[in-house]
């Protein structure tokens, strides 16, 4: 279970869309947006989000049963396990991500410090929200939109549809590509992340509420008494 928790944290912070489902009926060839257009369109899409709340389902799958899991010390069964929970976002920089099943874990930041809390292990990791952490997929929805061009190369395969694929510009990034798709309500509906180990992480959002009222205390964290605090 401890390894599962470490994997969940890695998927969420350092590694965290489903590839958009495309119709097999072809009416016309899609016209891709230029990189500048794609970036501008994504920034505009994200700018609609002041606050956001949703339930999520997150599943990671390996392209081969033995390859990636062996490197991570996980079995194929673990790699295909689905995590469920809730997330809340408030711009700028506030993020709450709580997994409720099968292992409970909370990741929260008020914009300066990231806390990763595991109640079963009675352990909390405290990490500074530096530029590297701020550019991870899980914080894309709450981060500074002006940094997108600096951190990612953005593509929009069909400029008539609201899904985008982002490629990190840094060479040592934990993921190779990130696809994010938005629904008719202008809120994110799903994300897919592909990493260098041949693994694909799918995050589906449901019960999405765009710009709801969220208490500021949601993004504050105080470790319970007796919690082992680890600074990174």
What is each of the regions a protein language model found here?
Residues 26-37:
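Cleaved targeting-peptide boundary
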